């Protein structure tokens, strides 16, 4: 069976690395995620990763508490680098050649982000983990995921959610009548104000015709199911739904 997507970017929340603790980095949890990614990688799919930093730091609440927003955001970017290094180590543990590239140069721990080098790594079947956001404050890691996916010409962004199995018209944890969407267009997401990604990230994905698949990462095997075209979660694309 052939994969539906040949090159993907997986977007993980920082909280996904925290496990049941909710904060920090839980190594067994990271290793479990890395194992799933490694199993997909064996099929020949080219994989890049963007990981948030919310398990270690959140810039907006810090700014609300009085910290300078720019400094708060830079602090968060460093958190994403920590997550990237830990994930890369876990992927190496499963025999996957992995590189970390950061938008802020820190040559002693990672490569600087260079698009051509990232593409070469992917073509050589290495996984690339992008850290430090886009290197500028005020931009989320969702926007980083959309931008890097466009730059590496990814077929899809896999938005791996913590315990959420797709996109709903209301919060399913608060509304028992919430309805899940199987398919949406990027335009519908923006028009309805659905909080999948921020508006900048949604617009980037729409303008560059990149599919977005939102699914529950807590169910083992779901990454592989998405890559091979099984209909789980919610698919967002530019195709008009029937």
From Swiss-Prot:
Positions bound to UMP: 53, 73, 134-141
Pfam families: AA_kinase
Taxonomic superkingdom: Bacteria
Keywords for this protein: Allosteric enzyme, ATP-binding, Cytoplasm, Kinase, Nucleotide-binding, Pyrimidine biosynthesis, Transferase
GO molecular function, one term: UMP kinase activity
GO biological process, one term: UDP biosynthetic process
Binding site for ATP: 11-14, 54, 58, 162, 168, 171
Regulation of activity: Allosterically activated by GTP. Inhibited by UTP.
The keyword Ribosomal protein is assigned to this record: no
UniProt keyword annotation of Ion transport present: no
TM region(s), chain numbering: none
UniProt record similarity statement: Belongs to the UMP kinase family.
SUBUNIT field: Homohexamer.
PANTHER family: URIDYLATE KINASE, URIDYLATE KINASE PUMPKIN, CHLOROPLASTIC
Entry protein name: Uridylate kinase
Name of encoding gene: pyrH
